[in-house]
């Protein structure tokens, strides 16, 4: 009976010692949070293991995640997966549908990313257009007009310059035959008669003003169809056209004139662009919106994935995943880290404590046997 009591007593004592030892060991992982000193000597095991090795733990966790979990290869594979493709394409489609449904304008779209488009157009737009035009003038001012125009346009003008004669003569004939032309001829005759006085008065004794005006009108109309007159007009137009082509830009427009044109043009362009920017995109560019919804979403998704894949290595270096994780872990309160680890490994920690009681009890049992027989 005495032997049994000794064995039971040793088992209980061993279990208590083993269990409490493991509980203390687990607590010492986290506590104390700071070192304690007696005089100038630091108390052993202060701070606890995790507070003491916190930076090393953060570094190792960051290294493991970067090298084995969130690797560049793994992210690249995930990025190129069909699921990612569909997700990006779906997001683009949603934004395009919102663009159509909400009747968003270009100005509203840019305002969502904190860009005042109207202000940008009025300041940067004017300056940019004027600067580009003035730079163009400075660079090409000594070149001829023909050399500055596109080759196709020069060829077209060369082929059709003779048609200007027909156009001008037809317009002149229509004008002279009209009531306005008749009235203008009569008005000019009145002025002419008033200026010439008595000499013209003698002419009116033989012909009336109306008959003179009618005769002049008929002759002018006849001249518009006369071959020689048309040849003269053609020659004048051709000569003027050739002179115009061969003129340097600075002879046609000096710097001040060109600068004035540049200012007016920049104001016109920016004002027009500002008005268009207030119109809904779906109204302004319906075909483009249809193209976006139909084909571009898939192409844009592929382009995004392709560019991300190409620059993924650079992006990951810029992000510095390891450093980010280290920094984040080092900012956690030790209380939070303790709660987090206990929450994750709660079952395992309880098992360790239970194992301490069991092993302590087993050791106590053998100690009891030794105490009896020795």
Curated annotation (Swiss-Prot):
The name this protein goes by in its record: UPF0754 membrane protein SAOUHSC_01978
Which family, according to the similarity comment? Belongs to the UPF0754 family.
| Any Pfam family hit | DUF445
Asked whether the keyword ATP-binding is assigned, the reply is no
Superkingdom of the source species? Bacteria
- Report the membrane topology from the UniProt record: Multi-pass membrane protein
Q: Where in the cell is it found?
A: Cell membrane
**Assigned keywords, A-Z:** Cell membrane, Membrane, Transmembrane, Transmembrane helix
Q: PANTHER family from the entry?
A: UPF0754 MEMBRANE PROTEIN YHEB (PTHR35791:SF1)
| Transmembrane residue ranges | 4-24, 354-374
Gene Ontology CC terms, in alphabetical order: plasma membrane
């Amino acid at each position: 009976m005495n032997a049994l009591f000794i064995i039971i007593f040793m088992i209980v004592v061993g279990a208590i010692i083993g269990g409490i030892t493991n509980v203390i060991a687990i607590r010492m992982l986290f506590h104390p949070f700071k070192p304690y000193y007696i005089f100038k000597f630091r108390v052993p095991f202060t701070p606890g293991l995790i507070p003491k090795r916190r930076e090393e733990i953060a570094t190792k966790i960051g290294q493991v995640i970067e090298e084995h979990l969130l690797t560049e290869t793994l992210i690249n594979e995930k990025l190129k997966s069909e699921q990612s493709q569909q997700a990006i394409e779906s997001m683009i489609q949603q934004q395009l549908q919102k663009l159509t449904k909400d009747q968003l304008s270009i100005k509203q779209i840019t305002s969502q990313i904190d860009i005042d488009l109207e202000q940008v157009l009025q300041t940067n737009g004017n300056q940019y257009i004027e600067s580009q035009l003035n730079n163009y003038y400075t660079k090409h001012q000594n070149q001829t007009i023909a050399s500055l125009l596109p080759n196709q346009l020069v060829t077209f003008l060369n082929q059709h310059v003779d048609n200007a004669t027909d156009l001008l003569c037809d317009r002149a004939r229509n004008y002279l035959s009209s009531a306005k032309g008749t009235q203008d001829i009569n008005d000019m005759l009145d002025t002419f008669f008033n200026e010439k006085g008595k000499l013209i008065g003698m002419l009116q004794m033989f012909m009336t003003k109306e008959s003179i005006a009618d005769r002049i009108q008929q002759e002018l109309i006849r001249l518009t169809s006369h071959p020689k007159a048309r040849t003269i007009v053609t020659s004048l137009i051709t000569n003027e056209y050739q002179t115009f082509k061969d003129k340097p830009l600075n002879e046609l427009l000096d710097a001040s004139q060109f600068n004035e044109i540049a200012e007016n043009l920049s104001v016109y362009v920016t004002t027009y662009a500002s008005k268009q920017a207030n119109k809904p995109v779906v109204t302004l560019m319906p075909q483009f919106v249809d193209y976006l919804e139909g084909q571009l979403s898939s192409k844009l998704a592929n382009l995004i994935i392709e560019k991300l894949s190409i620059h993924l290595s650079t992006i990951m270096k810029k992000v510095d995943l390891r450093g980010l994780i280290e920094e984040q872990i080092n900012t956690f309160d030790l209380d939070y880290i303790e709660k987090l680890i206990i929450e994750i490994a709660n079952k395992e920690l309880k098992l360790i404590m239970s194992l301490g009681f069991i092993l302590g009890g087993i050791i106590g049992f053998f100690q009891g046997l030794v105490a009896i027989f020795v």
